[in-house]
């Protein structure tokens, strides 16, 4: 880990108001499911899938916790098997009571600092439905903060989704990230 990444991780692991970012525990799965459900913007996965995320992908997932340890936000992500230097960010959500504080950006910065060191990640990908301006701003500003290129292309057309109507999913590809 470089000194710059250590400083970045320290800055984002402990935050004002007693908030902190760390890895999830399996016991956090139900809280992540609730936060996703309450977001009203994410495609809600089964409660079982959030338990699996917290068990199998804890190394590439971040949870923001209130001072009492309660999860108040999360990012689920995984390293793509066919592109082992690419982190795919699956979902980003922050509890309504904690929005507007830059928590999503801090989680994304902290998580990517960790995975670039631990997994050798050099780029991130995510998909965003058109009109999800909060996610568009989050990932566009991330690329700008890190001096990385940002490319966009439609990954999945609307017609591919069996549960119509569904907007197309636009792939955001950000990189290269510096180690």
From Swiss-Prot:
- What EC number(s) would the UniProt record show? 2.3.1.178
Matches recorded under InterPro entries: Acyl_CoA_acyltransferase, Ectoine_EctA, GNAT_dom
* Database matches in Gene3D superfamilies: 3.40.630.30
**Does the UniProt entry include the keyword Ribosomal protein?**
no
Single annotated GO MF: diaminobutyrate acetyltransferase activity
Q: Which family does it belong to?
A: Belongs to the acetyltransferase family. EctA subfamily.
Q: What is this protein called?
A: L-2,4-diaminobutyric acid acetyltransferase
Task: List the taxonomic lineage.
Answer: Bacteria, Bacillati, Actinomycetota, Actinomycetes, Kitasatosporales
The gene behind this protein is: ectA
